[in-house]
């Protein structure tokens, strides 16, 4: 028997079926960096329009986690697709280098600052520690396939950047937004420093909730207010609080001016005043079941009444406040100006003196109360409850009241509001808050709910506390008068001198400089240096001013896009917006894009205690970076991004489908030279023109979705193209023509031309996401080309179906619907054991005139499109008596299927009646003989 294998054009490629990404990707990376790929892209795109994605600097502290990977890969996808779109899209990665987390890590390594090591040495160790951490993170980011200027990143601890941060601060000062004030700020006892709002997280917390009585001093006035004789009675104004430790700082009691307050007699022995709307709630809480309402008045009438502190020997006034609420408590609030923003505002209104009785480590100072001297505030609650009991002021206590409470995000310990002298940026000076609200409307927020988020935060944001009591940070390099605390009159000029020193020697220069080194000798002894450092959010928030103008590749152009996690509305987006608006009057960005956080399949936050943490390093080690990148691109990152082993398995299946489609294309164009073998569109087989038309449609959709940052839609469309239009139809149908026709026939070269156009397009579609795989595919595509797909632009060789084509798009859709119905019948018949596959079948299509006319266009090639051994079209009326294997899924169509007649051709596997017609080729059909020794068959449609 003759072996006809050598007469077939069987697929061949060196492009492997198995990706083996964990092994192959590092080799690809080596080649990228050996060839200076990033620099090559910059050179190729140097004259193109700039697109600047400004990297929000991640904090330098340990190996990257999955959130880091999501952020960096999304940025890389955008920059690569922008390059394909014709932009020069450089990427300069950055790192946030100063601040408390670094100090804490260094303290763990060398011991406590000020005890085991002096500040100057400590700063030096911090700098070296940061450099080590950067190398760890850089290695991880590079392994992700992220292209960037990794040899020249920007660091907030670069000497020039530190100097420019100081210059940024000087602009804030010169524009009049900077001041020193004593205000309540979040204070962490372990940090011994103020915390930014973004450094505070709210956790479930148990506190003692207490109802406390303040005793009336002026019974006569109260009697007049309620029109009842209470002169000989004990009258109490009752407050409710979850912070008993703040009671020693009490300076007033507030009521709402417009609320109604009732005088209540309890068991005919006690008289209390509380909000009318909360009487029933309070009585139930204090377990009082017998009371009488004696009178009612407005909060306004209670103003300036005096009440005795429950366990300290001084009186406090009643004040009015719109902040008093009726959602809990008693409608009466005790005021401790040191420990609450609302309390502080009231204190300013009534000119109370702010007295701090708690030190930086959270202990009471001396002479507050004999039982509280030196006691830590959270440990004082039980002592204070005991004092209240002794004085008869405690009406009720709940020791396990659960509520949200601010915690230090670094130490995971509760914090307090503490009034301290700090440097602030005013949110309301020169109408800044309203300017910010106007500015945000000029920015595109993606998703658009981000605009509402940041708008709400701006409306409610207090003044920005810029100062920190730390060592490792950019200094606030000011000189203040020793007696008046006023800034030196030449502050701006002095800051420039200091910035020049820092530019040469780093922030250590500030601590090395003496006052007389900067200020003239005759006044040097009148001034002292400020030793506070800047909030690290000022460091990163000023990079649009301190970094962007310094990089030549940015051509002094402002950033187009900021892309970070949704937590950055109150972080980097906010700090950058404030600083930019203060200095330039404009937003620092044109677009802001946010992504959600990673969670497990059940929507739970990843944590070691739950055992659901998946690291990017694990994914890369087991599956490769392209799988991680594909999962990121496939996820709707505007929401929480779920990941699990099952989800990764699905991602791998998607990857295989894309890779196998690419491999099929490559395997069937291995002998194709696009310069010599391409077929002109007018001469191509119509199915091939349809395939190119579909690829063009997909490309337009893909580019549109890339432009909208809808990467999950990009992947879905590519997957649909590979699975449905290609895998389930085109690639299946062309196998007969590709394998059996003459090697150099127009029929085969037309098919190869289409596959070439498709792979040229597809490799670009996937390059921003599957960067390693796209690079591998690129090197296997025939024809002259540049070395890397990443220097290219979208493929322009695709075309639409021509008006000269007999089959238009509508006709093809009609055929595909018919084919789908035929496939259902084929599968049903196969399951019944009558046929083994579609080539075992012969079909008759009974169709109404319009449908029949469309199908008859295809003539005797119809069977090739249906992948059956024969197929004919008959008038619908002829099929009335047909019942076997009939399906009428399409109106006006009946299908009759039977086992094909004739013998099976050993070469093309079609059942034919002409097998054995040629003596020397007794086992193959006449068509195959023609393709082997004759001029070859001719096709027009399939």
Swiss-Prot record:
Needed co-factor(s): Zn(2+)
One GO MF term attached to the UniProt entry: zinc ion binding
Binding-site list for ATP: 608
GO biological-process terms attached to the record: isoleucyl-tRNA aminoacylation
Keywords in alphabetical order: Aminoacyl-tRNA synthetase, ATP-binding, Cytoplasm, Ligase, Metal-binding, Nucleotide-binding, Protein biosynthesis, Zinc
Cofactor, free-text remark: Binds 1 zinc ion per subunit.
Gene3D superfamilies in alphabetical order: 1.10.730.20, HUPs, Valyl/Leucyl/Isoleucyl-tRNA synthetase, editing domain
SUPFAM superfamilies: Anticodon-binding domain of a subclass of class I aminoacyl-tRNA synthetases (SSF47323), Nucleotidylyl transferase (SSF52374), ValRS/IleRS/LeuRS editing domain (SSF50677)
Compartments (UniProt record): Cytoplasm
Binding site for L-isoleucyl-5'-AMP: 564
GO cellular component entries: cytosol
Enzyme class: ligase
Domain remark text: IleRS has two distinct active sites: one for aminoacylation and one for editing. The misactivated valine is translocated from the active site to the editing site, which sterically excludes the correctly activated isoleucine. The single editing site contains two valyl binding pockets, one specific for each substrate (Val-AMP or Val-tRNA(Ile)).
Name of this chain's protein: Isoleucine--tRNA ligase
């Amino acid at each position: 028997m003759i072996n006809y294998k050598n007469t077939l054009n069987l697929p061949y490629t060196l492009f492997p079926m198995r990706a083996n990404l964990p092994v192959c990707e590092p080799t690809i990376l080596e080649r990228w960096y050996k060839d200076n790929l990033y620099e090559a892209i910059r050179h190729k795109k140097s004259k193109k329009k700039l697109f600047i994605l400004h990297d929000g600097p991640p904090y330098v502290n340990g190996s990257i986690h999955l959130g880091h990977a999501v952020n960096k890969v999304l940025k890389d996808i955008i920059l690569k697709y922008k390059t394909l779109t014709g932009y020069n899209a450089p990427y300069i990665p950055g790192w946030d280098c100063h601040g408390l987390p670094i100090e804490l890590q260094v303290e763990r390594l060398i011991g406590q600052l000020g005890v085991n090591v002096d500040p100057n040495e400590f700063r030096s160790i911090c700098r070296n520690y940061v450099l080590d951490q950067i190398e760890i993170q850089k290695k991880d980011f590079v392994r992700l396939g992220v292209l960037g200027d990794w040899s020249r990143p920007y660091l907030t601890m670069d000497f020039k950047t530190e100097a420019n941060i100081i210059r940024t601060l000087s602009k804030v000062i010169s524009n009049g937004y900077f001041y020193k004030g004593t205000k309540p700020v979040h204070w962490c006892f372990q940090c011994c420093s103020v915390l930014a709002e973004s450094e505070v997280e709210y956790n479930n917390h148990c506190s003692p909730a207490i109802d406390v009585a303040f005793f009336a001093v002026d019974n006569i006035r109260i009697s007049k207010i309620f029109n009842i004789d209470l002169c000989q009675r004990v009258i109490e104004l009752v407050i409710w609080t979850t912070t008993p430790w703040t009671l020693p700082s009490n300076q007033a009691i507030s009521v709402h001016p417009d609320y109604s307050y009732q005088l209540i007699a309890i068991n005919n022995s006690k008289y209390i005043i509380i909000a009318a709307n909360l009487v029933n709630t309070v009585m139930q809480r204090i377990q009082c079941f017998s009371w009488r309402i004696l009178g009612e008045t407005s909060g306004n009438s209670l103003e300036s009444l005096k009440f005795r502190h429950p366990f300290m020997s001084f009186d406090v006034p009643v004040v009015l406040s719109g902040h008093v609420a009726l959602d809990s408590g008693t409608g009466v609030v005790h005021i401790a100006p040191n420990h609450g923003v609302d309390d502080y505002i009231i204190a300013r209104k009534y000119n109370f003196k702010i007295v701090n009785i708690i030190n930086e480590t959270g202990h009471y100072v001396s002479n507050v109360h004999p039982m509280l001297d030196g006691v830590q505030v959270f440990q004082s609650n039980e002592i204070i409850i005991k004092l209240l009991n002794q004085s008869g002021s405690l009406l009720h206590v709940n020791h396990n009241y659960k509520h949200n409470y601010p915690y230090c995000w670094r130490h995971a310990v509760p914090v307090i509001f503490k009034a301290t002298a700090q440097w602030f940026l005013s949110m309301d000076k020169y109408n800044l808050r309203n300017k910010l609200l106007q500015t945000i409307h000029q920015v595109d927020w993606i998703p658009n709910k981000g605009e509402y988020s940041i708008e709400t935060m701006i409306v409610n944001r207090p003044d920005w506390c810029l100062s920190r009591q730390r060592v490792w940070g950019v200094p606030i390099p000011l000189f203040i008068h020793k007696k008046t605390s006023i800034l030196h009159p030449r502050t701006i000029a002095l800051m420039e001198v200091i910035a020049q020193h820092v530019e040469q020697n780093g922030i250590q220069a500030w601590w090395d400089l003496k006052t007389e080194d900067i200020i003239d000798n005759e006044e040097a002894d009148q001034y002292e240096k400020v030793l506070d450092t800047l909030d690290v959010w000022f460091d990163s928030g000023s990079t649009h001013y301190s970094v962007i103008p310094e990089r030549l590749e940015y051509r002094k152009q402002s950033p187009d896009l900021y892309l970070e996690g949704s937590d950055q509305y109150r972080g980097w987006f906010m700090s950058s917006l404030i600083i930019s608006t203060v200095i330039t009057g404009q937003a620092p960005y044109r677009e802001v894009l946010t992504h959600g956080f990673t969670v497990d399949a059940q929507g739970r936050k990843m944590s070691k205690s739950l055992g659901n943490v998946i690291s990017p390093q694990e994914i890369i080690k087991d599956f490769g970076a392209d799988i991680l990148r594909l999962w990121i691109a496939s996820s709707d990152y505007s929401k929480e991004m779920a990941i699990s082993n099952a989800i990764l398995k699905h991602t791998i299946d998607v990857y295989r489908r894309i890779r196998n489609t690419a491999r099929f294309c490559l395997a069937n164009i291995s002998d194709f030279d696009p310069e010599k073998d391409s077929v002109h569109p007018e001469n191509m087989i119509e199915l091939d023109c349809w395939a190119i038309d579909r690829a063009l449609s997909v490309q337009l959709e893909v580019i549109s979705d890339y432009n909208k940052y809808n990467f999950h839609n990009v992947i879905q469309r590519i997957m649909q193209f590979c699975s449905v239009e290609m895998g389930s139809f085109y690639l299946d149908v062309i196998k007969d023509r590709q394998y059996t026709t003459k090697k150099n026939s127009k029929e085969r070269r037309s098919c190869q031309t289409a596959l070439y156009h498709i792979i040229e397009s597809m490799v670009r579609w996937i390059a921003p996401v599957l960067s390693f795989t796209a690079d591998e595919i690129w090197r296997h595509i025939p024809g002259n080309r540049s070395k890397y797909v990443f220097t290219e632009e979208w493929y322009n060789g695709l075309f639409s179906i021509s008006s000269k084509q007999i089959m238009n798009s509508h006709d093809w859709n009609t055929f595909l619907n018919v084919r789908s119905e035929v496939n259902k019948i084929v599968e049903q018949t196969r399951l019944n054991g009558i046929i083994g596959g579609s080539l075992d079948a012969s079909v008759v299509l009974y169709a109404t005139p319009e449908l029949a006319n469309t199908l008859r266009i295809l003539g005797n090639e119809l069977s090739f499109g249906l992948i059956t051994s024969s197929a004919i079209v008959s008038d619908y009326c002829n099929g009335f008596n047909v019942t076997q294997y009939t399906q009428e899924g399409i109106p006006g169509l009946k299908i009759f299927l039977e086992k094909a007649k004739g013998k099976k051709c050993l070469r093309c596997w079609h059942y034919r009646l002409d097998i054995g017609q040629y003596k020397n080729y007794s086992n193959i059909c006449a068509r195959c003989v023609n393709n082997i020794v004759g001029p070859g068959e001719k096709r027009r449609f399939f």
